[in-house]
Amino acid sequence: MLESVLHALHLNETFLAMLISFLILVFILQQVAFKPILKALDERRQKVEESISRAENDLEEANRMRAENAAELAKARQEAHDLIARATKVGEEKAQEIVAAAQAEANRLKEKAVADIQREKEKALEELRSHVVNLSILAAEKVIRKNLDEPTQRQLVDEVINEVGKLPC
């Protein structure tokens, strides 16, 4: 009966034996080779997925760190800018204080010099008055001692003028 079915299907016994051998081989390969190969492929797929997941996590961490670094850099730049602004302000204030102190000192020295000059002027005027008084007294003594005629009077006035011209002013 099997022979008639095979013959009707145009199959021969060799083909049937080969088919049975192939099916047994597939079953054995499935038990022995396919399961380990599929298991190895599945493990490899899991490793690749884990690597991709780690890479994504690392990328997220790198992006987070880059954002933190950018924020810290911006903060440091702002702090440096603020520090420079404060230092500039303090420097300008110190410069203004120095200029104000120098102007005050210059004014004080000027006032002192003016006061010194005024004292010296008053002293010189006092000395001049003293000399003029002394010369006037001398002239009066000479007038009293002499009977003055006009040429003697002129000579006496010339002498007084010459002596006044010799005074240090």
Swiss-Prot record:
User: SUPFAM superfamilies, from UniProt?
Assistant: F1F0 ATP synthase subunit B, membrane domain (SSF81573)
Sorted alphabetically, the keyword list is: ATP synthesis, Cell membrane, CF(0), Hydrogen ion transport, Ion transport, Membrane, Transmembrane, Transmembrane helix, Transport
Q: Which Gene3D superfamilies match?
A: F1F0 ATP synthase subunit B, membrane domain
Annotated compartments? Cell membrane
Give any Gene Ontology cellular component: plasma membrane
An example of a Pfam family matching this protein is: ATP-synt_B
Q: Give the source's domain of life in one word.
A: Bacteria
Transmembrane annotation, as ranges: 14-34
Which membrane topology term applies here? Single-pass membrane protein
Xref: InterPro entries: ATP_synth_B-like_membr_sf, ATP_synth_b/b'su_bac/chlpt, ATP_synth_F0_bsu_bac, ATP_synthase_B_chain
Molecular function (GO) terms for this protein are:
proton-transporting ATP synthase activity, rotational mechanism; proton-transporting ATPase activity, rotational mechanism
Summarize the protein's role: F(1)F(0) ATP synthase produces ATP from ADP in the presence of a proton or sodium gradient. F-type ATPases consist of two structural domains, F(1) containing the extramembraneous catalytic core and F(0) containing the membrane proton channel, linked together by a central stalk and a peripheral stalk. During catalysis, ATP synthesis in the catalytic domain of F(1) is coupled via a rotary mechanism of the central stalk subunits to proton translocation. Component of the F(0) channel, it forms part of the peripheral stalk, linking F(1) to F(0).
Its quaternary organisation is: F-type ATPases have 2 components, F(1) - the catalytic core - and F(0) - the membrane proton channel. F(1) has five subunits: alpha(3), beta(3), gamma(1), delta(1), epsilon(1). F(0) has four main subunits: a(1), b(2) and c(10-14). The alpha and beta chains form an alternating ring which encloses part of the gamma chain. F(1) is attached to F(0) by a central stalk formed by the gamma and epsilon chains, while a peripheral stalk is formed by the delta and b chains.
PANTHER family given for it?
A: ATP SYNTHASE SUBUNIT B (PTHR33445:SF1), ATP SYNTHASE SUBUNIT B', CHLOROPLASTIC (PTHR33445)
The record's similarity note reads: Belongs to the ATPase B chain family.
- Name the record gives this protein: ATP synthase subunit b
Q: What is the lineage of its organism?
A: Bacteria, Bacillati, Bacillota, Clostridia, Eubacteriales
Could you tell me the gene encoding this protein? atpF
